[in-house]
UniProtKB/Swiss-Prot annotation:
SUPFAM superfamilies: P-loop containing nucleoside triphosphate hydrolases. Catalyzes the transfer of a dimethylallyl group onto the adenine at position 37 in tRNAs that read codons beginning with uridine, leading to the formation of N6-(dimethylallyl)adenosine (i(6)A). Keywords: ATP-binding, Magnesium, Nucleotide-binding, Transferase, tRNA processing. It catalyses: adenosine(37) in tRNA + dimethylallyl diphosphate = N(6)-dimethylallyladenosine(37) in tRNA + diphosphate. Belongs to the IPP transferase family. It comes from Prochlorococcus marinus (strain SARG / CCMP1375 / SS120). Residues 38-41 are annotated as: Interaction with substrate tRNA. ATP binds at G13, P14, T15, A16, S17, G18, K19, T20. This is tRNA dimethylallyltransferase. The record marks S104 as: Interaction with substrate tRNA. InterPro entries: Dimethylallyltransferase, IPT, P-loop_NTPase. Its EC number is 2.5.1.75.
Length: 299
């Protein structure tokens, strides 16, 4: 008799939708740990700007896939997938199911749909050369060698741009052509959280991040890794850098961060509706609805 397939529950949604709080409530009720699927929370020292679960929250419920690397040592999608699958395999032997929580669409897809990114190791010499050229030039080079990846990668996203170029110059093949799908042998339950007042939630959370010390956190990252750290170009940190340099006031930085976060949330919503098929939870009774759906699957 074959062993039943393990169950993996996913809670996905755009940034600031309330995933972390709901996930902790769910995890407490069904007695499982949480695997965070957030591309920036993988890095040490990036706590406030990424709204990483607090120490208190991590003490309440065990969290995995946090603080895997230093910010100056980018993790590839292949490395993340390997780490996450190994962690889930260990969880399946101890808990009733795996529980993935996050809003990083490509990272989620690598696990839930079995997206297999190329296993090309980091090429530090190439990366240094690409950084010397600058993001604008690199993105134009990408347009010529991998138009498909160029269309999908934001002109501001230096990490993914450099990775795509790294794969091309290392293998002679585009990162787009090397990605394949190998669905995992799991039963999957995807739950979605997308509150109607998301813009208000984003505005409120952005103010809180700055109040909690985002500028000091950014100063610490600059001190340790230098102001050219690519992750300092991401939402929140880039705006904090402008305050540190005296280019913008805190009020202006908060306003710009809010705008960029809203734009990002819009992209997340589009991705989730095209790439996933979750059961969208009613925001008024999301916990009860989630537990009911989970119970129907667990039995």
């Amino acid at each position: 008799m074959q062993n039943p397939k393990p169950l993996v529950i996913v809670l996905l949604g755009p940034t600031a939708s309330g995933k972390t709080d709901l996930a902790i409530q769910i995890a407490k009720k069904i007695k499982v740990s949480i695997h965070n699927i957030d591309s920036r929370q993988l890095y040490k020292g990036m706590n406030i700007g990424t709204a990483k679960p607090t120490i208190e929250q991590q003490e309440e419920i065990k969290h995995y896939l946090l603080d895997l690397k230093d910010p100056n040592n980018p993790i590839t999608l292949h490395e993340f997938k390997k780490e996450a699958e190994l962690s889930l395999k260990n969880i399946f032997s101890k808990e009733k199911c795996g529980f993935l929580v996050g809003g990083s669409g490509l990272y989620l897809k690598s696990l839930t749909s079995g997206l297999c990114p190329p296993s090309v190791p980091a090429q530090e010499k190439l990366r240094k050369e690409f950084r010397r050229l600058g993001q604008k030039e690199c993105h134009q080079i990408l347009k010529k060698c991998d138009p498909i990846a160029w269309e999908k990668i934001s002109p501001r996203d230096s990490i993914r741009t450099i990775r795509a170029l790294e794969v091309f110059y290392s293998t002679g093949q585009t990162i787009s052509s090397l990605k394949t799908l190998k669905p995992p042998d799991w039963n999957l339950l995807e739950l979605g959280l997308d509150p109607r007042n998301l813009q208000q939630r984003i505005a409120k959370r952005t103010k809180i991040l700055f109040q909690k010390g985002l500028i000091d956190e950014t100063k610490a990252l600059i001190h340790q890794y230098g102001e050219d750290l690519p992750l300092l170009q991401t939402i929140g940190y880039k705006e904090a850098c402008t305050v540190i340099k005296g280019e913008y006031s805190i009020t202006e930085a908060i306003e710009i961060t809010t705008q960029r976060t809203n734009q990002f949330a819009k992209k997340q919503r589009t991705w989730f509706r095209r790439q996933h098929n979750p059961k969208w939870l009613n925001e008024k009774n999301s916990l009860e609805e989630a537990l009911s759906l989970i119970q129907n699957v667990i039995g």
